[in-house]
UniProtKB/Swiss-Prot annotation:
GO terms for biological process: mRNA splicing, via spliceosome; positive regulation of transcription by RNA polymerase II; RNA localization; spliceosomal tri-snRNP complex assembly. This is Pre-mRNA-processing factor 6. The lineage of its organism: Eukaryota, Metazoa, Chordata, Craniata, Vertebrata. It comes from Mus musculus (Mouse). It is found in: Nucleus, Nucleoplasm; Nucleus speckle. GO terms for molecular function: identical protein binding; nuclear androgen receptor binding; protein-macromolecule adaptor activity; ribonucleoprotein complex binding; RNA binding; transcription coactivator activity. Identified in the spliceosome B complex. Identified in the spliceosome C complex. Associates with the U5 snRNP particle. Component of the U4/U6-U5 tri-snRNP complex composed of the U4, U6 and U5 snRNAs and at least PRPF3, PRPF4, PRPF6, PRPF8, PRPF31, SNRNP200, TXNL4A, SNRNP40, DDX23, CD2BP2, PPIH, SNU13, EFTUD2, SART1 and USP39, LSm proteins LSm2-8 and Sm proteins. Interacts with ARAF1. Interacts with AR and NR3C1, but not ESR1, independently of the presence of hormones. Interacts with USH1G. Phosphorylated by PRP4K during spliceosome assembly. The modification Phosphothreonine is found at residues 180, 266, 275. The modification Phosphoserine is found at residues 143, 279.
Amino acid sequence: MNKKKKPFLGMPAPLGYVPGLGRGATGFTTRSDIGPARDANDPVDDRHAPPGKRTVGDQMKKNQAADDDDEDLNDTNYDEFNGYAGSLFSSGPYEKDDEEADAIYAALDKRMDERRKERREQREKEEIEKYRMERPKIQQQFSDLKRKLAEVTEEEWLSIPEVGDARNKRQRNPRYEKLTPVPDSFFAKHLQTGENHTSVDPRQTQFGGLNTPYPGGLNTPYPGGMTPGLMTPGTGELDMRKIGQARNTLMDMRLSQVSDSVSGQTVVDPKGYLTDLNSMIPTHGGDINDIKKARLLLKSVRETNPHHPPAWIASARLEEVTGKLQVARNLIMKGTEMCPKSEDVWLEAARLQPGDTAKAVVAQAVRHLPQSVRIYIRAAELETDIRAKKRVLRKALEHVPNSVRLWKAAVELEEPEDARIMLSRAVECCPTSVELWLALARLETYENARKVLNKARENIPTDRHIWITAAKLEEANGNTQMVEKIIDRAITSLRANGVEINREQWIQDAEECDRAGSVATCQAVMRAVIGIGIEEEDRKHTWMEDADSCVAHNALECARAIYAYALQVFPSKKSVWLRAAYFEKNHGTRESLEALLQRAVAHCPKAEVLWLMGAKSKWLAGDVPAARSILALAFQANPNSEEIWLAAVKLESENNEYERARRLLAKARSSAPTARVFMKSVKLEWVLGNISAAQELCEEALRHYEDFPKLWMMKGQIEEQGELMEKAREAYNQGLKKCPHSTPLWLLLSRLEEKIGQLTRARAILEKSRLKNPKNPGLWLESVRLEYRAGLKNIANTLMAKALQECPNSGILWSEAVFLEARPQRKTKSVDALKKCEHDPHVLLAVAKLFWSERKITKAREWFHRTVKIDSDLGDAWAFFYKFELQHGTEEQQEEVRKRCENAEPRHGELWCAVSKDITNWQRKIGEILVLVAARIKNTF
């Protein structure tokens, strides 16, 4: 026995010995080493513990509180200024006075912070700007050099040598990873040696999508599936042909899953595959558990109250949305048994059942509910044959003869003659139905229709539509004198029967009459109700708004009636006559406009604009003598009117009656010597070539009106035309002394200096003009263009930046700034311009030109339309629009733009005025000027 005893047993362990360390074991502690777990309610070992400390939970709370009370109050957590990092009294209670003290200190801190906030922020901003100036970004340092890259030619670009690579060869030529397909011999070798084997995942079989290998959903494979007969590798060579066939078969299976077997088109989007899967889930809006809960809840409702129809309907619809249509049908049929008097249950049953079965269900419903209109309507809808529909509806009318809905449905299926007979019976059964009475009146003859409408008024004395239909009937048969009487009687009768006259409803009825062609009726309705319910001081404003509303709704006769009534009430109001005249000009005929203007000048003889509109209408129609006679009458009513004098002069000069024009101007200068009369006198002599007479008249005019800048401009331009540059400069300088705030004078003087080559002097003139006229966009724009024409693009860009700082909301500056940028930056600049000047026509025109330059034709056309809609007086916009249509539009589009421009009669625009005010074009029409301006435009932007 001693021989078998191990020699180390009973001996002390060597120093540092850890049992089990050699075989990898580690020390651990078990529950038996530390004792069983103790509940918080277990008593502690100390039986004499005071109350509050006798359980394990009380001891744990005490220890935790003791840990929380240990605050870090050593020197490392102390600061001389702030004290301890934590609060010395954090363990104390936070009372209301503590909260009040904290609020006071917070308010003091906030106040101290705001005292020098602006100064501090300004100082920080200046420091940042100074830092950026001293240390600019690399991009800013090379910005001027980058602009010069635009001047580099293509040959210079190609001649730039390639940048060398200073790295070593291995870094310069990295070895790319090469992927080589595994050869077939590799598979054959390992197949023969049996080192590897492959198997087909059961989830990839023809039952694709199942998580189990057998369609029955069992968790075990079918018998023999895991035996060596199937899952072990075979012996022999690999048959690559069979592998290829298997791969093709698998591909066909997958394609068949995502393809339409009928049309062959793919119906599953690979990118949205998961979304498509979600869409296949029934749209009940909940998961399976929610459906089960709802099903149980509805079952409980049905069992508790089996005669409650909504429970059966809800149960059937729940089964329907979950895809169990037959269960839904069974439920709803059971519901019809339990609730045979519920109309909704029968209709739901008819909806869920297929065609023939639905007819049987409806027939059964009719037996239980012979008075249900909805069931009869549903029965008619289920029939496909017209005769069957008629038969169903007639049967329904036998049971429910007072149903308007059934009568209407039945009448719609009949021929006119049968419908008339049926409606005669319908109005007897439903005498309070306005629609049936009106339908019968439409099918009857004139005499019978009058009788029908009279009966309708007797049965329904409170409906306005019967009266309006009667008025339309009389108008359609030529009795227009009866229309006014019928509408007046309608208002009286309705009021007598306690009906409140709703003005808005009657106006809508009048607009419907207008659209139907019943002009007399709509005008009579308007005259009858236009003044109802309006305060006397609000009448004019309200009526003008009503007229605008009618025009917007394309009810022109209603608007004409409103204007006619307003002119009767306000015959001496020039504004009403003017709006009516503009309405006739835009929507009426020339004859109606002239007739209105004749009445207008009779009531408002002092309204010059009305006289001028009448004369212009006659002149445009080619009736010059009539225009002269109108102006003669205008002279009698307004003997010293400047506008009428100038209109008469224009009429004579446009018709080549220059001597008449001279005599008229001479009379005007003697009787009404205004600055404009003198200006027109000078211009007439100038355009006729009488330069000396023009200069004499100009000198005479300046003696009377030296502060009228246009006279100084004309004097300088006449001298400039004669190549007398010194005299022209002197005229401009004298004019600027008298009119220092005239922008055109500054521009003319600057361009004169530029024309004779004095660029420095032109620049100085513009700088001086900007000092005397700060925040003037026109002067800034000319300064920018001056530098750009001189080739100093950098200075031009700098000036543009300053201009936009001084005039940040100037559309004309922003439009110029867009095209000062290089092409890639123009779009960004245009966005900035639109943010600053969203509704400025110059900015909109710049955006349209930008789209034009990018060949975005549709967008460009859209923005041109916006531009001319916002400001139709801007001739440049029309010229660019016309040029655009000449290049990209059809003849119809070009003609439309030209006609719209002629109707708008634009007067402003830089390019437009340069052509229209040229003395060689003084007799040209708007359309001719449009063509000339468009010809000058070169789309090099």
